[in-house]
Swiss-Prot record:
The lineage of its organism: Bacteria, Pseudomonadati, Pseudomonadota, Gammaproteobacteria, Alteromonadales. InterPro entries: Ribosomal_bL32 (IPR002677), Ribosomal_bL32_bact (IPR044957), Ribosomal_zn-bd (IPR011332). GO terms for molecular function: structural constituent of ribosome. Keywords: Ribonucleoprotein, Ribosomal protein. Residues 1-56 are annotated as: Disordered. It comes from Idiomarina loihiensis (strain ATCC BAA-735 / DSM 15497 / L2-TR). GO terms for biological process: translation. This is Large ribosomal subunit protein bL32.
Length: 56
């Protein structure tokens, strides 16, 4: 089993973890309705890329 020779300091541990943060979802504004939605997803009104794709 692998065992470290010396203990990693809190600073080294935290520097390694600095890239682990999660970003928020990427949002876009629909050109037709002006509604904010997630990228590559249909809006709540049923529009995708400016066209109506879901009929309610």
């Amino acid at each position: 089993m692998a065992v470290q020779k010396s203990k990693k300091s809190r600073s080294r541990r935290d520097m390694r973890r600095s890239h682990d943060a999660i970003d928020g979802p990427t949002l876009s504004v629909d050109s037709t309705t002006g509604e904010t939605h997630r990228r590559h997803h249909v809006t709540a009104d049923g529009y995708y890329k400016g066209r109506k794709v879901v009929n309610k």
